[in-house]
């Protein structure tokens, strides 16, 4: 996204190419946004990003298919939980969600099982590796410079120059802004910037 603006942008990557880490190792599922807290930034980004993704995939030349998603259930307890997700999705603006019975489940996906399900038509799938590469190629075409094999070892502040000094195993870079997108190593970069590291638990 930053490559669309008149900025001088560089990416420091410790690997020798893009798509060598977490970015290309996820499920490849485009989420609809029915699991995120209503009103949260994550919910807003998920729903808006979902709605825009057909155009994004087209611009990047990345294969993408809106397969829809089935959240299946068997018991009354399952139904109660699924209806909670449906309510969350409706608050977040997810369109087209509906409860379906076993016959309709079998028409959509005979292997899914379940006595009932929530059908979410806006979910989809893509190849996360191709998507990551597509984003990088697009950014490169727009003028972003990629520096590979550049593991960041330290970040300090130079107040006199009003810049951050980023040191890698090979070079030193000076920048007005640092964007931490280090995946599973993001906490290490945050600590270099002076932010405390604290553990969090997923759901």
Language-model features, listed with the residues they occupy:
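Hydrophobic anchor at the start of a short beta-strand
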Residues: 7-9, 96-97, 178
């Amino acid at each position: 996204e930053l490559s669309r603006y008149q900025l001088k942008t560089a990416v420091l990557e410790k690997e020798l190419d893009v798509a060598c880490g977490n970015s290309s190792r996820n499920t490849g599922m485009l989420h609809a946004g029915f699991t995120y807290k209503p009103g949260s930034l994550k919910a807003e980004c998920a729903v808006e990003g979902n709605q825009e993704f057909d155009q994004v995939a087209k611009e990047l030349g990345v294969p993408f298919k809106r397969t829809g998603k089935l959240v299946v259930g068997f018991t009354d307890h399952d139904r109660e939980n699924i209806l909670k997700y449906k309510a969350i999705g409706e608050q977040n603006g997810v369109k087209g969600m509906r409860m379906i019975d076993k016959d309709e489940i079998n028409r959509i996906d005979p292997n899914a099982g379940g006595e009932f399900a929530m059908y979410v038509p806006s979910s989809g799938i893509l190849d996360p590796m191709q998507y990551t590469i597509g984003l990088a190629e697009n950014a490169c075409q727009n003028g972003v410079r990629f520096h590979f094999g550049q593991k960041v070892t330290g970040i300090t502040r130079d107040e006199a120059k009003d810049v951050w000094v980023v040191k890698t195993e090979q070079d030193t870079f000076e920048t007005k802004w640092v964007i931490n997108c280090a995946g599973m190593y993001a906490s290490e970069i945050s600590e270099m910037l002076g932010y405390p590291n604290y553990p969090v638990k997923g759901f």
